[in-house]
């Protein structure tokens, strides 16, 4: 997945992955993590998600990482927020209150950039990546996030041979292998196939959405 792919998706407004409301799993399960107020929460590949503002509204410091400048600009504009913009290494950092959005390639982060993130929220990052990049992504999180880091992970699981991603299928086995050494608790599994015409038309008979509570 080259950066140009995602830049074009945003330029063409092909952002079906963007949700027009705060994610219900986030609202339902985040309180179970019992993170301390003002904890720093990492949101990889965040787009302009409404979830960022929700997390900040709950009293957390939010670090979102997003490749598309258009998405970052859109977030602050749509929320009526003025942002200070500065350069940090390879990233353009947009900051307003408790929200920081780092515009750049997630894989160019340095260990110290996320070393104090004791929370993790991944609704659409892992499933946006093809296999080799997923493996690298999970290695990075496992190596650099601090012990005790807690979060939520949402995945999709379907017959990948029927449909190309993104979103990509990430099965339970791959998640458990990729996050080996983490405590993984499956909180909910939802069958979405009847709500997903694209997958039905491709011949899929199942599209499972899984929600995990994770702890390093």
Swiss-Prot record:
SUPFAM superfamilies in alphabetical order: S-adenosyl-L-methionine-dependent methyltransferases
Sample GO molecular function, one term: thiopurine S-methyltransferase activity
GO cellular component: cytoplasm
Entry EC no(s): 2.1.1.67
InterPro entries: SAM-dependent_MTases_sf, Thiopur_S-MeTfrase_Se/Te_detox, Thiopurine_S-MeTrfase, TPMT
Annotated catalysed reactions: S-adenosyl-L-methionine + a thiopurine = S-adenosyl-L-homocysteine + a thiopurine S-methylether
Keywords (A to Z) from UniProt: Cytoplasm, Methyltransferase, S-adenosyl-L-methionine, Transferase
Domain of life, source organism: Bacteria
Annotated compartments: Cytoplasm
Gene Ontology process terms (BP): methylation; response to metal ion
Uppermost EC category: transferase
One Pfam family, short name: TPMT
Entry keyword Mitochondrion: no
Residues reported to bind S-adenosyl-L-methionine: 10, 45, 66, 123
Membership in a protein family: Belongs to the class I-like SAM-binding methyltransferase superfamily. TPMT family.
Name under which the protein is recorded: Thiopurine S-methyltransferase
Organism, scientific name: Pseudomonas putida (strain GB-1)
GN (gene name): tpm
